[in-house]
Amino acid sequence: SLSIFTEDGSMGTQGRVTDPIQGLLDNTDIIYACGPMGMLKAISKIAATKEIPCQSAVEESMACGIGICMTCVLPVIGDDGVTRMVRSCTEGPIFEGSKVRWDEIGRVPPGTYGGPK
């Protein structure tokens, strides 16, 4: 089923999606989320506590749209456990929420592959 929440109540239920989401997850197999980075971070955290996959469509500036300018990079943990700066325009814009290092967006985290030591 589809549940819609808008902060202003213009569609669906009024409120932030993080308010009612806990009650919706009991029979949920996967979460698809799009919106501001703060909301995606919050939903991904909730999903991780319930061990539910969360596909997050990030809203990142994509100046060139083909990966050359590197303005859309995000720190994402790979299947090998290594953090890499990935381009959301070419390798995304959808990422597993538990793999994005939400607190490190806008910088290169320590230990990132190819990053400063």
Place the predicted regions along the sequence by residue:
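Reductase modules of NAD(P)H-dependent flavoproteins
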Residues: 1-117
